[in-house]
Each structure stands twice: as C-alpha cells, then as structure tokens.
C-alpha cells in the first residue's frame, strides 16, 4: 500500500500507475550496491549537499552515483498531469530501493528541500514497501520529514540567530550565512521567503525533466 501526500481529487489512478511504472523502468538498469545502507546514506549527507554547487547538467549523474553506493536507484523523472508527485520510493522484490523525483515546480531550493525530505523518509523507515510523496496533505510523518530535511540543510539554532540578528536584510550576509551551512544562498533565501521574512522574488530553476 502506498502512503499518500496529496488531495486524492487531483490524482488520476491510471496516470499515477503509468508514472510509477515509468519510474521502475527508468531505474531498472542502474547499478547499485547489493543492499540499502541507511547509515552510509546518513554519512553521505555532506557529500549530497556539495552537489548543489555543481553545474546543473552534472547534478543528476553525481546524485545517481552517490545513491547507488547506498543501494538506492535514483532518477529525476518527468511529471504527468494527474500525478502531482514530488517523490516516489519503492522497495523492490530483491530488496533494492528506488527513489524518483520530479521537477514539478523546478525551483532549485524546492528541489533540494524535497530531495532531503525524501532522504528523511528513507532514514525514518517510512518506506516499508512503497511511498508516494505528493504535493500536499500533512501529518506527523510528513512533519517529521520536513523538520529533518530543514535541519540537514540549515542548522535550526544557527538559523534562528541569523534571523534574530536581521542578517537577512543584506544579501552579503545571506551569502555569508549560506557558506557557513555549506549550501547555496538560494537555500537560505527560499526558507526566508517561505517563512515570509523576506518578499518572494526570482530564484534559480532547473530544467532537466
């Protein structure tokens, strides 16, 4: 059974089934470690964060290589109308794990937050068989994954100090703080915008899928 993160009225079950099948086919030939290693995945968090500093056309290849070492077949896939999916995680019959993501909104900061959100689901054991991560619908499982993803990207205590000092009022300070967290400045900007601390403005997008 799949765990849902969406309003089901937006989901076409036939489209969703086709999309899931596409994920399975696109990850079928990816060479991965014999078994899922969640401890190694946790250890690789700093390496995964470093990937955001690479050129956009190199990111998917590098992420695929990192996840492969952890026994996870990773792929960024196109999204379909009728399947408002952010991520799909499935344990295969041979014990491997598939992790697919879409670029529905294409914003770079949302991509990285969603990626770490999916990683949190893996580390939290939310993927016993199959987990479909849609765009909406909340709950304890989702809140926990959101919190963990946010912490992976930006230390919450240091972020609170940064906000309290009003460093967000200067772009140079945003860049400086981002460097202390080993993330791109758009990660900090995205969080500040989401929390309505700064106004919404243009930010980088990806165009892979």
Language-model segment annotations:
Residues 1-209:
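Active-site hotspot residues in diverse enzymes, especially metal/ion-binding acidic/histidine motifs
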């Amino acid at each position: 059974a799949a765990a849902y993160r969406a309003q089901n009225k937006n989901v076409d079950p036939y489209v969703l089934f086709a999309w899931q099948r596409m994920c399975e086919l696109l990850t079928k030939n990816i060479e991965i470690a014999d078994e899922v290693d969640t401890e190694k995945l946790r250890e690789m968090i700093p390496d995964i964060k470093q990937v955001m500093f690479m050129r956009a056309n190199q990111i998917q290849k590098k992420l695929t290589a990192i996840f492969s070492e952890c026994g996870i077949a990773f792929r960024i896939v196109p999204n379909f109308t009728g399947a408002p999916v952010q991520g799909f995680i499935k344990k295969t019959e041979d014990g491997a794990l598939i992790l697919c993501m879409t670029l529905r909104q294409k914003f770079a900061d949302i991509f990285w937050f969603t990626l770490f959100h999916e990683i949190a689901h893996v580390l939290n054991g939310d993927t016993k068989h199959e987990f479909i991560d849609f765009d909406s619908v909340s709950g304890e499982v989702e809140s926990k994954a959101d919190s963990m993803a946010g912490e992976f990207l930006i230390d919450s205590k240091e972020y609170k100090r940064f906000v309290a000092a009003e460093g967000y009022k200067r772009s140079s300070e945003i860049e400086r703080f981002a460097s202390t967290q080993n993330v791109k400045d758009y990660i900090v900007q995205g969080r500040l915008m989401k929390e309505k601390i700064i106004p919404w403005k243009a930010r980088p997008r990806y165009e892979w899928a």
